Amino acid sequence: MRHRHGLRKLNRTSSHRLAMLRNMSNSLFQHELIKTTVPKAKELRKVVEPLITLAKKDTVANRRLAFARLRDRDMVTKLFTELGPRYATRPGGYTRILKFGFRQGDNAPMALVELVDRPEITEAPAEEAAE
């Protein structure tokens, strides 16, 4: 019986799935907004939310746990210096999944995954550079 097995395999081997989710987590922490398929987005949420909760308390042990999951020193630093303090008062729900239509080639349902309360990027610097 398949009771209580709450993991989507995403048609990948376990090492491929782990590497893919690690790369997607790093991309989400770096850009704070990524585009992916809906099933991958839902699995990514299960990885990212506990990491942000871990980053609320900046200890050496927590940094080591986050590094074991992310394997990227710069993203661990950003996680603990920017994202942890940003969500210190929020009790969970750090990500938002927005449906984004269907992919052209295979009609896969797409989604935007973003960190809530992310700073808005203004278009003014791009206009100044054009002038």
Swiss-Prot record:
The keyword Iron-sulfur does not apply. One of its GO terms (biological process) is translation. The keyword Zinc does not apply. Keywords: Ribonucleoprotein, Ribosomal protein. InterPro entries: Ribosomal_bL17 (IPR000456), Ribosomal_bL17_CS (IPR047859), Ribosomal_bL17_sf (IPR036373). One of its GO terms (cellular component) is cytosolic large ribosomal subunit. One of its GO terms (molecular function) is structural constituent of ribosome. Gene3D superfamilies: Ribosomal protein L17. Pfam families: Ribosomal_L17. It comes from the Bacteria. Part of the 50S ribosomal subunit. Contacts protein L32. Belongs to the bacterial ribosomal protein bL17 family. HAMAP family: Ribosomal_bL17 (MF_01368). NCBIfam families: L17. This is Large ribosomal subunit protein bL17. The lineage of its organism: Bacteria, Pseudomonadati, Pseudomonadota, Betaproteobacteria, Burkholderiales.
